[in-house]
Amino acid sequence: MKIKFLSAAIAASLALPLSAATLVTSFEEADYSSSENNAEFLEVSGDATSEVSTEQATDGNQSIKASFDAAFKPMVVWNWASWNWGAEDVMSVDVVNPNDTDVTFAIKLIDSDILPDWVDESQTSLDYFTVSANTTQTFSFNLNGGNEFQTHGENFSKDKVIGVQFMLSENDPQVLYFDNIMVDGETVTPPPSDGAVNTQTAPVATLAQIEDFETIPDYLRPDGGVNVSTTTEIVTKGAAAMAAEFTAGWNGLVFAGTWNWAELGEHTAVAVDVSNNSDSNIWLYSRIEDVNSQGETATRGVLVKAGESKTIYTSLNDNPSLLTQDERVSALGLRDIPADPMSAQNGWGDFVALDKSQITAIRYFIGELASGETSQTLVFDNMRVIKDLNHESAYAEMTDAMGQNNLVTYAGKVASKEELAKLSDPEMAALGELTNRNMYGGNPDSSPATDCVLATPASFNACKDADGNWQLVDPAGNAFFSTGVDNIRLQDTYTMTGVSSDAESESALRQSMFTEIPSDYVNENYGPVHSGPVSQGQAVSFYANNLITRHASEDVWRDITVKRMKDWGFNTLGNWTDPALYANGDVPYVANGWSTSGADRLPVKQIGSGYWGPLPDPWDANFATNAATMAAEIKAQVEGNEEYLVGIFVDNEMSWGNVTDVEGSRYAQTLAVFNTDGTDATTSPAKNSFIWFLENQRYTGGIADLNAAWGTDYASWDATSPAQELAYVAGMEADMQFLAWQFAFQYFNTVNTALKAELPNHLYLGSRFADWGRTPDVVSAAAAVVDVMSYNIYKDSIAAADWDADALSQIEAIDKPVIIGEFHFGALDSGSFAEGVVNATSQQDRADKMVSFYESVNAHKNFVGAHWFQYIDSPLTGRAWDGENYNVGFVSNTDTPYTLMTDAAREFNCGMYGTDCSSLSNATEAASRAGELYTGTNIGVSHSGPEAPDPGEPVDPPIDPPTPPTGGVTGGGGSAGWLSLLGLAGVFLLRRRKV
């Protein structure tokens, strides 16, 4: 049977995501009459009368007062250099209505392509709002369009906005105040409110300890509205931390003393661990002063999201921050770094060089309290000096000879290559397997046989059980809940060294990251890669070198890998497993193929664009040929081992569209077909197919009917053939849905036909939908073809509150079996510089979240399994392909298993068919011993050898500094300088201080 149970976190239905935001302006400059008169280079003008006001400020000390005398006579905030909001989804603004009547107003965004004629409304986006009488409200403007009353120009570009207009929609004169314009492009799901104990801290070296908060320091000067106390609830160092309750906005803490950090290095930063265990985001600001500052210094800021714990740091040189993933990958070759900068982009004030030998104050203060809150609390711990992560020097020699973090020590770090070589045999001797399943890993007590997908399966099938739950069915006829691990191969363990195939493109920064480059498993011409500072050049696999040191050969590694899967209770080798493992004869596997890339592929017409690439034209004859070539490749890979073949994935995370943006990305790929030339049938088979469908199935009455629906003026069907850029209009929606379905159906059906020709009666598992790349139309088309639907789901669970209620409803309505191709959680306590797509606070938290996710999947009637991505941690210095540097493995880069993860997996996998497996918990006294359910002795056993030494101890902390006069923190809004040009690894990055 399928077990119906949920963890407490899922059953409690975690809060919906909260928004993170970046400040654009809060109008703190004195003069906005011209962009030349203020450091933000903004201009406020227009037909309405506007002025800077100290009344009704919602962020900082000032707002803009706008006096409107008639409808559609605007006040406009201009940025003539334009804002790039391409990565954002929402612009928000605080509006104060001091009048006794409600006021309806409009916001209109203008992009720079409207120049020079100022008449093309397609370059604008307009929406309407109502602010209630005598209230302050925050309004959100959808940068992608789609609101009920929004007019979103088909050519509007959110990455080049030059103007934000505010205007009345009625003629009654009114006064409104505007403040705190922000943009928002990401969300965070807060964890349960009970918080975590001993949460993570950034794995970077401490140069000097400032404060560990075991007690409240006597040199701390809190403002009158701040209450401080020690806490043990959230601790990153020692046994206690400091909780600071802020009872009013712009309250702060001042650590006052004298510190000498001049000898710690040229580029350093002050770091502190901060936790926000509330339901509201908090803006936190910092100021660092020296003996000469006299209260005049730059303010830098960061958003601490609801439920978030992280390390933040303030650069003592004010080096520019790499705030986006694209910037980090481009400059460093790393997707993420382990701490968040207090940045100039989120602060204000000109930086003045500090005398690091005479630092006198460290200040932290918050912005406004969240709406409706009377106080907000942050927990501070482990304040120290670190190398400045904004500067290249922080990454020098970050890896040791085994590719481990060379800056700190941590649990599971291997002490030396000599110790690594001793670890394989003891682990092999401890491994066993679960006893409560059949030879395939199925449930011997369940034999589903209703509504089976395949009439005569060659190996695995999918059927319903007596309770109406979908189940995979193994060759023995038993229910099989597929749990497994992806990417069991060496290909993605390579990292770029910085040596380029083109000497002019080498990265000295990348080269500085390594203390030693192994001589084996080196690819001198890796690439071209997806992204990074070196597009093609030398790459090395530390993991592959380590497995040879640990196990002596790849054959032994493959053997122990399969034995680990059995020991941990996994019954499937997940996607992108090395085909050499297919013949293992013990653990079933999934195979995979690529429809358009690989050897002997013919060129195929490409449609539109996407994160991983455009879509292939499925009507192109070469596409069918390539699919057949792919199917033959898969057949050759699985030949002789078909019995253990669970099913076949083809392609991955294709960019079909996005459900959140009807007028934009939802139908962008479908509309892109019309931008291809169909005048020759061979030039765009997709275009000709679309025209045929429209003429013969949608508009059989003639072209005039299409013109009426689409607002076009085609003289004939032939006139639709040339390439043209069509903008979405509401009259197209039903046609777009129909055509998107046809496109996807042709793709899935062509692939399925090729697979069934070579591998009949094996399960086709689809293409692994990403949340950002699927629409209901495409899902429906896939369901008409594939045997088992597949999704990659990076959420805390598949519960509606965590994932997608609409997607779940569609799955249940379609009533197909579903498998999850990818999910994971990552943490920083393994020495990694990045957690993963979904974060955890520790290895224990990773394990707990993994089990909760699996429980949610196992409890749903349609879901038949889930595979963890991935087997091996990303390289510490980033995956060669795209800089991915996550702690998401079941093993580290020394091939050391994460014991907390493997123990949790074993206990869940043992119990997923209904057995009480609590005796396998690593909390039991006889945890490592064999028993009735498990033949191994591996529970609670670490395979990392003796503890690795600490690379270096920090400088002794100074004696508590003398007590200077008490100082207060003054509030301020978001004024900022215009541009800062600084170097990072020889690459000059032009950085805007605000969005």
Curated annotation (Swiss-Prot):
Pfam families: Agarase_CBM (PF17992)
Listed EC numbers: 3.2.1.81
Residue ranges of the TM segments: none
Domain of life: Bacteria
Biased composition annotated in UniProt, kind: Pro residues: 948-965
Keyword Isomerase: no
Chain segments annotated as coiled-coil in the UniProt record: none
Listed GO MF terms: beta-agarase activity
Residue ranges, annotated region (Disordered): 936-972
Keyword Signal recorded: yes
Keyword field: Glycosidase, Hydrolase, Signal
Signal peptide (UniProt feature, chain positions): 1-20
Enzyme class: hydrolase
Recorded catalytic activity of this chain's protein: Hydrolysis of (1->4)-beta-D-galactosidic linkages in agarose, giving the tetramer as the predominant product
Stated family: Belongs to the glycosyl hydrolase 50 family.
Chain's role: Hydrolyzes agarose and also neoagarotetraose to yield neoagarobiose.
Protein name (Swiss-Prot/TrEMBL): Beta-agarase A
Source organism per UniProt: Vibrio sp. (strain JT0107)
